[in-house]
Swiss-Prot record:
It comes from the Bacteria. GO terms for molecular function: ATP binding; ATP hydrolysis activity; ATP-dependent DNA damage sensor activity; mismatched DNA binding. One of its GO terms (biological process) is mismatch repair. It comes from Streptococcus pneumoniae (strain JJA). HAMAP family: DNA_mis_repair (MF_00149). This is DNA mismatch repair protein MutL. The gene is mutL. One of its GO terms (cellular component) is mismatch repair complex. SMART domains: DNA_mis_repair, MutL_C. Pfam families: DNA_mis_repair, HATPase_c_3, MutL_C. InterPro entries: DNA_mismatch_repair_CS, DNA_mismatch_repair_MutL, DNA_mismatch_S5_2-like, HATPase_C_sf, MutL/Mlh/PMS, MutL/Mlh/Pms-like, MutL_C, MutL_C_dimsub.
Length: 649
């Protein structure tokens, strides 16, 4: 029978370390938060080998008194709270007194500290949680904590560490979040002698954003603010033109503490409304100041999850703050860009009826579609009047061709035994079999469509032999573009187009680090970025399959996708890249196109390997048969048939 015993202090600390200290980034987080609570205005983080060999945090805070240094390494020893009431009004980042003893239990820890007015400082050395020495030492006011050989006595934890690049990325992300949470503090992160991140510590949030995300991104962010009796909201969000492929660039802080909250993320997106594309997310740095009594941070070991009273009111306040700030922005660049790409149809001239005679049909086998000459258009352009003036012969012929049913080219296809159909000895069963085969071929082919209109700048209407077809113009062009890109990206042409003015791309330090590791994937699709300055890359030439006007947005999109890829597969990456590029370059909803462009799109769609679905799997067209239409208008009756059953994909 096993007996209940009290665990030794060191073992208890190691158990606590399993919850609090997951990786080197956890050590950085806990020690930097202690430095912030100590009132520091400057914090320097130095690491070696992604923190596994060494992590050193130096601050200019209040320091620790000589007689309290050893006590700081005991569990639940803290200066942050004194009684139970303090637990419900936490104003500091730390309060449990677990971090320092947990870190010391799985590393070799050296602490050097001094307080203002003391004759000397104090040095403490601990190994695996056991204090080896505490001696007087010379030290400036503040604290320096050096953590070496992390997880040396817990090899199982060390075994599951990721690559140094991945661990370094986590550390950079932690420091970036802390820098955004406290713009009044100067942060500096140095990895193996190279500075990765620096913030000025001026107290200006926009300057902190510029130091982390770059000046270009900071300029494209707008200020937000809102408040009520319980909450005060401030911060910056990006304009709709600056987005990312994931939520990693959304930072929420409550009383200076970085938190993760799904509902508040939802509120941010609601504030943008329809201004964001599907699958795109803004950059956001939002500070929420709240009475500590309304927030419970003691619900998770890492303290990143917070329970908030009046959460619905807070969500509404965040959404309102963002929506109000966006209303004040003209967003003219987006409007001009859309206007430049749009085509407005001329509704005043009847020359719309004088169309290429063969463009109503989509399959051209031997002859190319011909357009009437400019002379023909001038000679036969006719103005329609209410008196019903006679049209010229040419105009009548044109209208006659438009109103005739489209030619069914697939009906002209000959089966393999076509010549045998006229054979006098061929029986009726063979003839029926041949026709059945012909019908199957017709059913499996894309229908011949005759375009006749557009609705709401989004849907195209066309008729075929067997009824009405409604086509989603965005999905249709997305399918066309996808198959083009799939071909061009799948077989990368090494030909490059030289740029007169190179493009400079800037990323946060953790993203830049990850991109360096995965750069060969970009090169596989013909994109060659070279390092250029701190956390910057330069593009001097671009692949010929990429349009020059889409280089900047396209490269950022590709890099975003690359950063999301956890298991690198060039085949999967190329497929996802083709989908992304096709979606971005396709016609959007509420975009009117002229008749010629619509017919051309339908022709291109008919040539696709799979014209029925967009790359995301959504249907491209919906079909209503003539019989379906007659049922809708009750021209014929059929029992137990609902309108929902009439649409067919």
């Amino acid at each position: 029978m096993s007996h209940i015993i009290e665990l030794p202090e060191m073992l208890a600390n190691q158990i606590a370390a399993g919850e609090v200290i997951e990786r080197p980034a956890s050590v950085v987080k806990e020690l930097v938060e202690n430095a912030i609570d100590a009132g520091s205005s400057q914090i320097i983080i130095e690491i070696e080998e992604a923190g596994l060999k060494k992590i050193q945090i130096t601050d200019n805070g209040h320091g620790i008194a000589h007689d309290e240094v050893e006590l700081a390494l005991r569990r639940h020893a803290t200066s942050k709270i004194k009684n139970q009431a303090d637990l419900f009004r936490i104003r500091t980042l730390g309060f449990r007194g677990e971090a320092l003893p947990s870190i010391a239990s799985v590393s070799v820890l050296t602490l050097l500290t001094a307080v203002d007015g003391a004759s000397h400082g104090t040095k403490l050395v601990a190994r695996g949680g056991e204090v080896e020495e505490v001696i007087p030492a010379t030290s400036p006011v503040g604290t320096k904590v050096c953590v070496e050989d992390l997880f040396f006595n817990t090899p199982a934890r060390l075994k599951y560490m990721k690559s140094q690049q991945a661990e370094l990325s986590h550390i950079i992300d932690i420091v970036n979040r802390l820098g955004l949470a406290h713009p009044e503090i100067s942060f500096s992160l140095i990895s193996d002698g190279k500075e990765m991140t620096r913030t000025a510590g001026t107290g200006q949030l926009r300057q902190a954003i510029a130091g982390i995300y770059g000046l270009v991104s900071a300029k494209k962010m707008i200020e937000i603010e809102n408040s009520d009796l319980d909450f005060e909201i401030s911060g910056f969000v990006s304009l709709p033109e600056l987005t990312r492929a994931n939520r990693n660039y959304i930072s929420l802080f409550i009383n200076g503490r970085y938190i993760k909250n799904f509902l508040l993320n939802r509120a941010i997106l609601d504030g943008f409304g329809s201004k964001l594309m599907v699958g795109r997310f803004p950059l956001a740095v939002i500070h929420i100041h709240i009475d500590p009594y309304l927030a419970d941070v003691n619900v998770h070991p890492t303290k990143q999850e917070v329970r908030i009273s009046k959460e619905k009111e807070l969500m509404a306040l965040v959404s309102e703050a963002i929506a109000n700030s966006l209303k004040e922005q003209t967003l003219i660049p987006d409007a001009l860009e859309n206007l430049a790409k749009s085509t407005v149809r001329n509704r005043e001239k009847v020359e719309q009826t004088i169309l290429p005679l063969k463009e109503n049909t989509l399959y051209y086998e031997k002859t190319e579609p011909s357009r009437p000459s400019q002379t023909e258009v001038a000679d036969y352009q006719v103005e329609l009047t209410d008196e019903g003036q006679d049209l010229t012969l040419f105009a009548k012929e044109t209208l006659d061709r438009l109103t005739k049913p489209a030619k069914l080219h697939f009906a002209e296809r000959k089966p393999a035994n076509y010549d045998q159909l006229d054979h006098p000895e061929l029986d009726l069963a063979s003839i029926d079999k041949a026709y059945d085969k012909l019908e199957r071929e017709e059913a499996s082919s894309f229908p011949e469509l005759e375009f006749f209109g557009q609705m709401h700048g989004t849907y195209l209407f066309a008729q075929g032999r067997d009824g009405l077809y409604i086509i989603d113009q965005h999905a249709a062009q997305e399918r066309v573009k996808y198959e083009e890109y799939r071909e061009s990206i799948g077989n990368v042409d090494q030909s490059q187009q030289q740029l007169l003015v190179p493009y400079i791309f800037e990323f946060p330090a953790d993203d830049a680090l990850c991109l360096k590791e995965r750069m060969p994937l970009l090169e596989e699709v013909g994109v060659f970025l070279a390092e250029y300055g701190e956390n910057q890359f330069i593009l001097r030439e671009h692949p010929i399959w990429m349009a020059e006007e889409e280089i900047e947005s396209g490269i950022y999109e590709m890099c975003d996708m690359l950063l999301l890829t956890k298991e690198v597969s060039i085949k999967k990456y190329r497929a996802e890249l083709a989908i992304m590029m096709s979606c971005k370059r396709s016609i959007k909803a509420n975009h009117r196109i002229d008749d010629h462009s619509a017919r051309q799109l339908l022709y291109q769609l008919s040539q696709c390997d799979n014209p029925y679905n967009c790359p995301h799997g959504r249907p491209v067209l919906v079909h209503f048969t003539k019989s379906d239409m007659e049922k809708m208008f009750r021209r014929i009756q059929e029992n137990h048939t609902s309108l929902r059953e009439l649409g067919k994909y």
